[in-house]
Amino acid sequence: MTNIRKIHPLMKIMNNSFIDLPAPSNISSWWNFGSLLGACLALQIVTGLFLAMHYTADTTTAFSSVTHICRDVNYGWVIRYLHTNGASMFFLCLFIHVGRGLYYGSFSLSETWNIGIILLLTVMATAFMGYVLPWGQMSFWGATVITNLLSAIPYIGSDLVEWIWGGFSVDKATLTRFFAFHFILPLIIAALVMVHLLFLHETGFNNPLGVSSNPDKIPFHPYYTTKDLLGVILLILPLMTLVLFFPDLLGDPDNYTPANPLNTPPHIKPEWYFLFAYAILRSIPNKLGEVLALISSILILAIIPLLQTAKQQSMMFRPLSQCLFWVLVADLYTLTWIGGQPVENPFITIGQAASILYFSLILIIMPMVSLIENKMLKW
């Protein structure tokens, strides 16, 4: 008799996606981050739902409602800090996931890669709007500065900003719509994840060697379900350490001051996971230029498949490209550090140099080095 999981219409989909899915026998722990991102998304949706039950999206009560959650709601502080620090873990996994795709040439699966970029942009938009909701000083001024960048768009810029604000400044209308979008976007992200997986299962997995996975495949369960479960446990450890011992380590002290439109904080900066893009934005003195640089810093991922000159898909056997990849990682670390520093020398100069290096590495240096490697390996 055929197992019910293979014939039941609903269970069959689950079975083909997570149980009998043919997976390469040699994918390493770097492939764990997809499932960790799924776990992070589930955590964010659940904790966010409970927070939404007690939060009020009104400028007069938003800040006090967050305080009420932390002080008066049973385990409200755990839910709140799981949500804020869960976002940090989400982005950490996202960056590693994208980095793994770059290192092992997963961008050759173009549909999966492009949906991934859309997912990255959607998650960034969701996180930005979520940061505005507690209505602290950094929430208010972060929203003002970032939304105001749209005024650099010719002709329609000013109208667009006022349309997003719902008035002539960041106010009640802005907070209400940001809460509405912050609530609905994770559900859209979940739908996009399904599309991401659909395309991935159409083409099959990449693997560390960058060769065809077809000759040797194993079922996803129990091998990779067990491996993913270990990954989830290892992710829970640092997350719970942050939540229970250092809940405000990654936050900004200014956000514990209620929003005040008449008092600008000395250093306006976003959460740590946006600092690299913020540093690139700040390194250009022209307003339209900085908006284009900010967008390009993410959308540059979309043209990476077009810049691929290497004859080998993976960087596994390309030591020069490996060195450049880690230079790129170090450059992103530098940009993240610079984004959190005040706008003064030498930070401005370092930020500009790191921004130029970031674009040069991806657009010029890495494709050229790949061509040199082709010659060296006599491809």
Swiss-Prot record:
Annotated positions binding heme b b562: 83, 182
Residues that bind heme b b566: 97, 196
Free-text remark on how the cofactor is bound: Binds 2 heme b groups non-covalently.
Coiled coil segments of this chain: none
Cross-referenced InterPro entries: Cyt_b/b6_C, Cyt_b/b6_C_sf, Cyt_b/b6_N, Cytb/b6-like_sf, Cytochrome_b, Cytochrome_b_C_euk/bac, Cytochrome_b_N_euk/bac, Di-haem_cyt_TM
Gene3D superfamilies on file: Cytochrome Bc1 Complex, Chain C
Gene Ontology CC annotations of this record: mitochondrial inner membrane; respiratory chain complex III
Amino acids binding a ubiquinone: 201
Pfam families per the UniProt record, alphabetical: Cytochrom_B_C, Cytochrome_B
Membrane-crossing residue ranges in chain numbering: 33-53, 77-98, 113-133, 178-198, 226-246, 288-308, 320-340, 347-367
Molecular function, one GO term: ubiquinol-cytochrome-c reductase activity
Protein's UniProt keywords contain ATP-binding: no
Membrane topology: Multi-pass membrane protein
Keywords, in A-Z order: Electron transport, Heme, Iron, Membrane, Metal-binding, Mitochondrion, Mitochondrion inner membrane, Respiratory chain, Transmembrane, Transmembrane helix, Transport, Ubiquinone
Localization (cell): Mitochondrion inner membrane
Function: Component of the ubiquinol-cytochrome c reductase complex (complex III or cytochrome b-c1 complex) that is part of the mitochondrial respiratory chain. The b-c1 complex mediates electron transfer from ubiquinol to cytochrome c. Contributes to the generation of a proton gradient across the mitochondrial membrane that is then used for ATP synthesis.
Oligomer status and interactors: The cytochrome bc1 complex contains 11 subunits: 3 respiratory subunits (MT-CYB, CYC1 and UQCRFS1), 2 core proteins (UQCRC1 and UQCRC2) and 6 low-molecular weight proteins (UQCRH/QCR6, UQCRB/QCR7, UQCRQ/QCR8, UQCR10/QCR9, UQCR11/QCR10 and a cleavage product of UQCRFS1). This cytochrome bc1 complex then forms a dimer.
Note: Heme 1 (or BL or b562) is low-potential and absorbs at about 562 nm, and heme 2 (or BH or b566) is high-potential and absorbs at about 566 nm.
Record family assignment: Belongs to the cytochrome b family.
Name the UniProt record assigns to this protein: Cytochrome b
